[in-house]
């Protein structure tokens, strides 16, 4: 703390004294030995600047004193470490006045105003702290390393004593008993406790050195927040007064008199009862402080002593316990001594120095404030995230009440609305698909992600029938008006029928008068040039312009029909709908011409049966539309199932009552009901059968939309020559009626199309091979059956193994139980005999059991065959608990008296060989024959459960004698009878019996767990070991801890309805 007496020797230029080399060398050597690290080519200040060596020195003296060392190569990191070092020194017992300032180690080479003298003084402050730390380490019990040689510091101490003598004023008196004694006594007397004393209200506002390092006064905090700077207790503020040499010098503080302090409390600037009017707001305080600084700078400059302030507002209290060594403000530069105190040049020089110091300090404070604001913002972000996480946990666990909890849980209406929205999006994407692969990918992706109402459909692979359904059913693509669009998806995901084929069509023109062609129809009468157009051209995913209106809900004769089930009149009802949708517009392309739905303009449908072809006539009625009754009259089918997938043709029964019919011929090959419902046998020998023998396949119930529609239900013909009439709206607009020709390969020569006009032009177009398609469908179905069979077999084997394992464990449990009972009976001293009274008691209890077991009797009589088989398989059953059954079915009365009552001892009466858990029975599909599984709470488990079909043999071990059983019944208390009920249950996780240990039972869901098996199904964490209870959620049959449940909720995994 070298400080020359500027006030006494103002005319002599000061030369910086060389630092005491022995003290530097000893301090450096001691630090290197203790820490094991070398300074290298760095000097003393540079080696200690980052504070890492100092912190490691403290940890070597007392391990764990500095928890975290900041090793970043920044000045702020060094300041952090230095502050941690000074804090650790306090914990070792060093006092405030023995510590250097954190800024004493900063690099001041680039500062203009800091001279060599100030640099030397700061290093001496560091050496003094090392000296006291060495003394503390020598007395520390946990330190056993190298001791600091205190003799090397004698030169430093003597030099500081000399400086103290020079700087001291004549008014002060110090004892001459030695520097160290004076130092220690003064420190222990007036310097050691940080008393937070202040001068008068003007001086002490900014005398930051008088404050405690850890508890800055309120005005600093207020000013730090109002300036935008952090309130920092390690470095000074820019509004600080110019230093007082006598007051601020470290050695002067150590030797100053302990004058009486004013009894001003620490929080004197906070409003309280005693000084409510003395509180000065922070902005006013700052202005006063600034005015006071200028006043003090002038008074200090003109003072004869350089440090004594002549103007005081109140009684002066010297602040001798200043916690700082105030790095940049303590010393005036040596040039000040050469200037006369009263000259104007000296005043200007002082003002210049003051401004430079302010600028440097402002820059330092700005850097520090930026760094602190960065750290503060990062901390606030962390705190905010933590609060959000806790709030989310409270919300999910329901601690904030049900109202907030309900906000995070969707209602059923919201779930349904979201499901409908997903389905609409799926329909749009599916409708806009450009290729078959893309459409199948969209559908498969939806099925994998969401359930389609039936859980079975989730696992079904999509059959490749989309191409056929779109090439022959273009009306199914009109999703938006469909009231229940999911029906189409269900239909698409069902296995396709075995036999399918398409319709090959050609159209030939014939000369018919134009007036007749357009008579009696409601379609637009614009004339179109006749074209020959291919019908049913396979454009799988295109859609006509107006086909959106085709698919609507329809009702025929009071029956509402759904897509999957074709009721009578459905096809006619569909044909009545939307004629404008199927009618092509004025500018029709070839593909649009026949992609509409073939609809009927309220005209009757009749079929004319030929030997190898069917003739469909078109009649355009001039009268009002008639009500169709052909499809609504249902005839009795003979109940046969058409194994070949062929349908006999149905016939209509209505004669048209007006206009001359215009004929066109159709020949239809064999078709699948899912492709078109106009289905006729392609075998010539079947063509001649009676039309009433229309067979209805089961697959027809699953068939979807239709294209060329005839009724599925057939009606008996009322006329000898039935005739079908269809009105095609796209024929109405043509001047000449086109011939619709559907060639049959086997009967092409017999087709009546040869009788038509020679101008008919047949068209060749693409058609898939029905035989190849049939083979593919059969192969697919066989593969599915094989996979199902394998899966079923695996499940059966697994169930069999689990059942046998459970049987063995139950038998082992019962065997041990009876061994214990036998030992207890053998150890009993009281002799037991079977008396007549005991026999009577047994028979009475048996009759009570019979009365309570009537339901068991009824159940067992329902399946006597199985009981006979079971008795033949298990010859040892008389030792088990089915003696009741033997009694009912004519067992010997002697066995009654020796067989224990099932109600008396449920553990004994439960049959060993035939017991099975109800869950296992349900999985194995064992027929129960009306037997109800016994609930877990029912103590008398005397119900006889039949064997599952997978069991081969039971290994039933013989039990103890009936005498011992009888004795056991008489001794047993009702409390003992219930103790092993859970032992018969199987763990839902590992499949083993629960036994007698701790178990977790959720009876409402039929879930049973060993306490060690009660784990989260996702993270496998233990759920049953919490002291304060466990929050368990069961999601899709799987145990979920709170963390995994919240994670799955935030990931958005859907819960099935």
From Swiss-Prot:
The keyword Coiled coil applies. Residues 269-278, 472-481, 514-534, 606-615, 663-672, 736-760, 896-908, 931-953 have a biased composition (Polar residues). Residues 354-439, 782-823 form a coiled coil. It is found in: Cytoplasm, Cytoskeleton, Stress fiber. PROSITE patterns: CH, LIM_DOMAIN_1, LIM_DOMAIN_2. Residues 229-260, 382-412, 694-704, 856-872 have a biased composition (Basic and acidic residues). Residues 251-641 are annotated as: Mediates interaction with MYH9. The modification Phosphoserine is found at residues 169, 177, 192, 201, 204, 207, 217, 226, 231, 233, 297, 303, 377, 471, 518, 523, 603, 672, 719, 751, 757, 760, 973. Residues 204-213, 835-847 have a biased composition (Low complexity). Residues 633-646 have a biased composition (Acidic residues). The modification Phosphothreonine is found at residues 215, 402, 472, 529, 537, 725, 899. Residues 21-128 form the Calponin-homology (CH) domain. SMART domains: CH (SM00033), LIM (SM00132). Pfam families: CH, DUF4757, LIM. The modification Phosphotyrosine is found at residue 313. Interacts with MYH9; independently of the integration of MYH9 into the myosin complex. Actin stress fibers-associated protein that activates non-muscle myosin IIa. Activates the non-muscle myosin IIa complex by promoting the phosphorylation of its regulatory subunit MRLC/MYL9. Through the activation of non-muscle myosin IIa, positively regulates actin stress fibers assembly and stabilizes focal adhesions. It therefore negatively regulates cell spreading and cell migration. Belongs to the LIMCH1 family. This is LIM and calponin homology domains-containing protein 1. It comes from Mus musculus (Mouse). The gene is Limch1.
């Amino acid at each position: 703390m070298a400080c020359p007496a500027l006030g006494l020797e103002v005319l002599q230029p000061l030369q910086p004294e060389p630092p005491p080399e022995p003290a530097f060398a000893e301090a450096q050597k001691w630090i290197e030995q203790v820490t094991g690290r070398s300074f290298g080519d760095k000097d003393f200040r540079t080696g200690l600047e980052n504070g890492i060596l100092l912190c490691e020195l403290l940890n070597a003296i007392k391990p764990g004193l500095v928890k975290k060392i900041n090793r970043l190569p920044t000045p702020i990191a060094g300041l952090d470490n230095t502050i941690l070092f000074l804090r650790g020194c306090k914990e070792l017992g060093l006092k405030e006045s023995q510590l250097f300032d954190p800024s004493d180690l900063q690099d001041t080479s680039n500062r203009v105003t800091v001279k060599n003298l100030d640099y030397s003084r700061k290093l001496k402050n560091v050496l003094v702290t090392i000296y006291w730390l060495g003394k503390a380490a020598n007395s520390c019990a946990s330190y056993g390393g190298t001791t600091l040689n205190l003799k090397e510091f004698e030169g430093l101490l003597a030099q500081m004593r000399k400086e103290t003598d020079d700087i001291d004023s004549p008014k002060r008196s110090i004892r001459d008993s030695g520097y160290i004694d004076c130092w220690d006594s003064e420190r222990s007397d007036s310097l050691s406790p940080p008393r937070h004393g202040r001068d008068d209200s003007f001086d002490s506002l900014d005398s930051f050195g008088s404050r405690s390092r850890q508890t800055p006064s309120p005005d600093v905090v207020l000013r730090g927040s109002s300036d935008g700077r952090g309130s920092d207790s390690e470095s000074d503020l820019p509004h600080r007064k110019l230093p007082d040499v006598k007051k601020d010098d470290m050695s002067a503080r150590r030797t100053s008199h302990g004058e009486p302090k004013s009894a001003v409390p620490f929080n004197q600037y906070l409003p309280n009862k005693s000084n409510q009017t003395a509180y000065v707001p922070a902005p006013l305080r700052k202005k006063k402080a600034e005015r006071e600084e200028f006043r003090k700078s002038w008074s200090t400059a003109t003072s004869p002593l350089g440090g004594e302030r002549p103007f005081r507002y109140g009684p002066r209290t010297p602040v001798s316990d200043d916690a700082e060594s105030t790095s940049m403000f303590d010393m005036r530069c040596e040039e000040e001594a050469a200037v006369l105190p009263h000259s104007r040049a000296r005043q200007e020089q002082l003002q210049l120095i003051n401004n430079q110091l302010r600028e440097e300090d402002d820059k330092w404070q700005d850097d520090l404030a930026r760094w602190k604001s960065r750290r503060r913002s990062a901390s606030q972000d962390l705190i905010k995230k933590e609060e959000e996480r806790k709030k989310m946990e409270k919300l999910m666990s329901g601690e904030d009440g049900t109202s907030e909890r309900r906000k995070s849980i969707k209602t059923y209406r919201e779930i349904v609305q979201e499901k409908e929205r997903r389905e609409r999006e799926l329909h749009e994407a599916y409708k806009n698909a450009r290729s078959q692969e893309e459409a199948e990918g969209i559908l498969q992706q939806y099925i994998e992600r969401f359930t389609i109402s039936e859980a079975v459909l989730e696992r079904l692979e999509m059959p490749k029938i989309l191409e056929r359904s779109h090439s022959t059913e273009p009306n199914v693509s009109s999703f938006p008006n469909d009231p229940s669009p999911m029906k189409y998806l269900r239909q698409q995901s069902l296995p396709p029928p075995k036999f399918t084929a398409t319709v090959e069509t050609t159209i030939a023109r014939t000369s018919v008068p134009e007036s007749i062609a357009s008579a009696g129809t409601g379609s637009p009468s614009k004339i179109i040039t006749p074209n020959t157009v291919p019908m049913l051209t396979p454009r799988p995913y295109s859609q006509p312009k107006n086909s959106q209106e085709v698919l609507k809900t329809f009702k025929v004769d009071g029956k509402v029909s759904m897509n999957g089930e074709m009721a009578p009149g459905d096809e006619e009802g569909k044909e009545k709908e939307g004629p404008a949708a199927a009618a092509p517009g004025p500018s029709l392309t070839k593909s649009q011409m026949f992609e509409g739905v073939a609809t009927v303009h309220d005209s009757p449908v009749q079929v004319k049966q030929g030997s190898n072809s069917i003739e469909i006539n078109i009649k355009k009625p001039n009268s009002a539309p008639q009500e169709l009754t052909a499809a609504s009259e249902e005839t009795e089918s003979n109940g046969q199932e058409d194994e070949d997938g062929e349908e006999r043709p149905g016939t209509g029964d209505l004669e048209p009552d007006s206009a001359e019919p215009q004929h066109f011929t159709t020949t239809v090959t064999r078709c699948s009901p899912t492709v078109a419902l106009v289905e006729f046998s392609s075998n010539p020998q079947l063509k001649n059968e009676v039309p009433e023998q229309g067979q209805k396949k089961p697959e027809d119930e699953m068939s979807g939309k239709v294209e060329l529609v005839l009724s599925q239900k057939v009606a008996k013909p009322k006329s000898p020559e039935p005739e079908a009439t269809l009105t095609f709206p796209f024929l109405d607009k043509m001047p000449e009626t086109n011939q619709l020709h559907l060639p049959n390969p086997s009967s092409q020569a017999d087709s009546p199309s040869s009788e038509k006009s020679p101008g008919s032009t047949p068209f060749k177009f693409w058609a898939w091979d029905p035989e190849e398609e049939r083979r593919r469908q059969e192969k697919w179905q066989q593969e599915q059956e094989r996979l199902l069979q394998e899966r079923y077999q695996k499940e059966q084997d697994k169930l069999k193994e689990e059942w046998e394992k459970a049987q063995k464990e139950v038998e082992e449990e019962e065997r041990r139980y009876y061994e214990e009972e036998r030992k207890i009976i053998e150890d009993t001293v009281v002799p037991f005999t079977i008396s007549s009274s005991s026999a009577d008691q047994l028979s009475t209890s048996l009759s009570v059991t019979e009365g309570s077991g009537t339901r068991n009797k009824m159940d067992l009589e329902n399946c006597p065959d199985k009981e006979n088989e079971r008795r033949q398989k298990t010859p040892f059953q008389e030792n088990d608990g089915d003696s009741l059954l033997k009694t009912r079915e004519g067992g010997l009365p002697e066995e009654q008296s020796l067989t224990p009552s099932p109600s008396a001892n449920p553990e004994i009466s439960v049959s060993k060989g035939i017991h099975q858990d109800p869950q296992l029975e349900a999985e194995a599909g064992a027929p129960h024959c009306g037997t109800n599984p016994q609930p877990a709470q029912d103590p008398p488990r005397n119900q006889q459960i039949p064997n599952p079909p997978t069991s081969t043999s039971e290994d039933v071990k013989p039990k103890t004698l009936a005498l011992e059983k009888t004795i056991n019944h008489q001794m047993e208390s009702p409390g003992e009878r219930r103790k092993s009920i859970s032992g018969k249950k199987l763990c839902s996780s590992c499949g083993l019996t629960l036994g007698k240990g701790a178990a977790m039972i959720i009876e409402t869901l039929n879930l049973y767990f060993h306490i060690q098996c009660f784990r989260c199904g996702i993270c496998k964490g233990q759920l049953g070991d919490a002291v304060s209870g466990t929050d368990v959620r069961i999601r899709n049959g799987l145990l979920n801890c709170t963390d995994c449940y919240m994670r799955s909720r935030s990931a958005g995994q859907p819960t099935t309805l």
